[in-house]
């Protein structure tokens, strides 16, 4: 099941166009790598169908997008092992990483835990592309996970990239856009 909330959050069209690929990649990964088979879910006391939640909101000075699945969570030992096998880090480095640091390995170019390419997520676009796209928008991407509970990706973008409602004012043959949040009163001066 896909649950979408926060549909009134506004972003500039060009930003949305740049985020389509990264968001699609995270959603595909949630389906392919996150959600367990119905039999595994039943053994864990979960509903047979997985749930992915897509939520967007404005928090302080940021637009935040959260994509959460109720799947199996991230096996950090497997992540570290895959990074060592692909030559991204040494075994000594892998042994010293905590869970948060292990999650960051997933954003390195060339990283994958997949043994084979799949129809769902194996398109050759990794989380490194997700991260570079979001960073190119002056944002950040992070991940939290609990084994057996699920995984949540957080994308944070500066609100300056969001659509801001403004009052257009013309004075002395110059046009100004004043954010409505800064307007207390409007009066015509003759």
Language model segments and positions:
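Conserved transmitter core of two-component histidine kinases
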Residues: 2-5
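ATP-lid-like helix-loop hinge signature
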Residues: 9, 13, 28-100, 147-148
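Short acidic amphipathic alpha-helix that forms the conserved interface helix of the HATPase_c
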Residues: 16-28
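Residue-level signature of catalytic and energy-coupling elements of molecular machines
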Residues: 26, 106, 120, 173
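Activation segment
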Residues: 90-95, 112-119
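Short alpha-helical Gxxx[C/S/T] motif in the catalytic ATP-binding
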Residues: 106, 126, 130
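Flexible nucleotide-binding loop
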Residues: 123
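Conserved secondary-structure micro-motifs at functional edges
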Residues: 132-190
